[in-house]
């Protein structure tokens, strides 16, 4: 049976992650309160941030920025999109 969490992003009970997706306290907090569906929303948002800001994930400054945005995305009312961002049309 799948592990269920009360997802902080979706505001409902949903299937939880299989393991902490990030090291440290933030990873533990995400594991305990974020669903798989919400994590996928973050992955898409993170990809957009990396592309729009032309970040290199191995750069310590970029990693710190993404960590802060991840915390905001899940626990502080949401991460904002870059100024002037236009979502691709389908």
From Swiss-Prot:
One of its GO terms (cellular component) is cytosol. Gene3D superfamilies: Fe(II) trafficking protein YggX. One of its GO terms (biological process) is cellular response to oxidative stress. One of its GO terms (molecular function) is iron ion binding. It comes from the Bacteria. It holds the Pfam family Iron_traffic. Disulfide bonds: none annotated. Keywords: Iron. InterPro entries: Fe_traffick_prot_YggX (IPR007457), Fe_traffick_prot_YggX_sf (IPR036766). Belongs to the Fe(2+)-trafficking protein family. Could be a mediator in iron transactions between iron acquisition and iron-requiring processes, such as synthesis and/or repair of Fe-S clusters in biosynthetic enzymes. This is Probable Fe(2+)-trafficking protein. It comes from Thioalkalivibrio sulfidiphilus (strain HL-EbGR7).
């Amino acid at each position: 049976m799948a592990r269920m969490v009360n997802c902080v992003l979706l505001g409902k009970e949903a299937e939880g992650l299989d393991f902490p997706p990030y090291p440290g306290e933030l990873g533990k907090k995400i594991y305990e309160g974020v669903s798989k569906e919400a994590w996928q929303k973050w992955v898409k948002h993170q990809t957009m941030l990396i592309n729009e800001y032309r970040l290199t994930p191995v750069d310590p400054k970029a990693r710190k920025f993404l960590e802060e945005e991840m915390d905001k995305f899940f626990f502080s009312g949401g991460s904002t999109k870059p100024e002037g961002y236009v979502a691709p049309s389908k």
